[in-house]
Amino acid sequence: MGLRSFLILTTLALASCGGGSPPAATKSAPPAPEDIAAGNTVPDEAEPPSAEPSETPAPAPAASNEANVAAPTSAHFQVGKNYTRLSPTQPTSSSPDKVEVAEIFWYGCPHCYALDPSVKSWIASKPEYVSFVRMPVVWSDVAKTHARAFYTAEALGKIGAMHDALFREIHDNRNLLDTEDKLAAFFGTFGVDLASFQSTYESAGVQTKVQRADELGRRYRVASVPTIVVNGKYVTDAGMAGGVEQLFALIGELAASEHSGK
């Protein structure tokens, strides 16, 4: 299936997850398109009574429309409506010669799961000057556990095989993977022995990356996922952009503008 097909299909199901609520115990209907445009909120039924309260992000630099600065996008997209500009520009994890496009996500978010096929199709055709990174959100205990799982899989060289599988296990198999023991068993199905998993999961390297993701999430003022941050400067999502197809068009314009300024 091509990128355009993925984009059209995903638009019908995509909104965003806010506050770190875990997936519902039973599969809920996708949000309607008007819910997406209304403000990127998760339907009430998607938040079970046992949902863990979200953590309030620490104060961070506010997003600014900077009306006195020429918009780097075409007339189709407006700063303050389709994307916001962070002021000052925030750090990235990519080399200076690259334009970083970061996807802020959570494995427990059904909308992140829905967007993932489109993200992968876009990665396959992105410009060479774009560096794509995934950054897990860290706004609750469950989200932090999933962030540690992401960086553990990355450190073990398993993220390529396990990224999709983590989404499927949580959403299709209804296994939240919210404890170290559950994750250890799951990693075992990918040939990772218990000792290797534990030493990596509890390592200083993984802890440092989780802390860095937490810091950047606060700096980027991430309030919902999936969120896209272009070069530490521009923040958008599918709801703001007007849909999934528009989201990737906007990412392309913002990235091209940043590249031309290097």
Residue ranges of model-derived segments:
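C-terminal cap of thioredoxin/glutaredoxin-like
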Residues: 5, 19-44, 49, 190-262
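Structured loop/turn residues at beta-strand edges in well-structured enzyme cores
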Residues: 12, 128, 223
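ABC transporter ATPase nucleotide-binding domain signature
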Residues: 187
